A protein has these predicted regions:
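RNase H-like (RuvC/DEDD) metal-dependent nuclease/polynucleotide-processing core
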Residues: 1-174
Length: 174
């Protein structure tokens, strides 16, 4: 992790330290300077617009980002280190993921999987994005996203998280 302000280049918070997810969460909850813009290198939700649902067919599935984060946290509550393997193996969620061992769920969408609007924009720009429903290989982006959703669920009352809190004003934001 690094911090910077308008006068300096980024500086590591604890140079040489290997942060655990729990340590990152603790620092963000307790030591984050006021009026800070926080950036995360992860996706904050899954594809929704294409099917008007994160998990089509899951009648009690989440209908928005905060509900998604809460669901991931609830299903994975017993996993240490903000892990999220339990969610990918959940009977209602598993059909939507490509998982290790050649297990591609029937609702993964084939190819590179279902895309959010941002992946569609990347493809139009000439990039080769992959779905965050992909949990295997070098192109997997979903594992970090799921862990990040647990982090966001726990931080949502600490500061505003764009876009799900777009209209709210806070001293800090992510």
């Amino acid at each position: 992790m690094a911090c910077c302000d308008e006068r300096r280049t980024p500086a590591l918070v604890r140079p040489g330290h290997r942060w655990s997810r729990g340590e990152v969460l603790h620092w963000l909850e307790n030591d984050l300077p006021d009026d800070t813009l926080v950036g995360f290198d992860m996706s904050m939700s899954f594809a929704f617009d294409d099917a008007k649902a994160y998990f089509p067919g899951w009648t009690e599935g989440p209908s928005g980002a905060r509900a998604l984060w809460a669901l991931v946290e609830t299903v994975c509550a017993d996993e240490p280190h903000l892990g999220a393997t339990t969610f990918a193996d959940h009977p209602q969620a598993a059909p939507h993921f490509r998982r290790h061992g050649g297990r591609e769920g029937a609702l993964f969408g084939g190819g590179r999987g279902r895309f959010r609007q941002t992946e569609h924009a990347q493809a139009r720009a000439g990039c080769r994005p992959y779905s965050n429903f992909n949990l295997v290989g070098a192109a997997q982006v979903g594992k970090g996203s799921l862990a990040g959703m647990r982090l966001l669920h726990r931080l949502q009352h600490r500061f505003a998280i764009w876009r799900s809190h777009a209209a709210e004003i806070s001293a800090s934001a992510a």
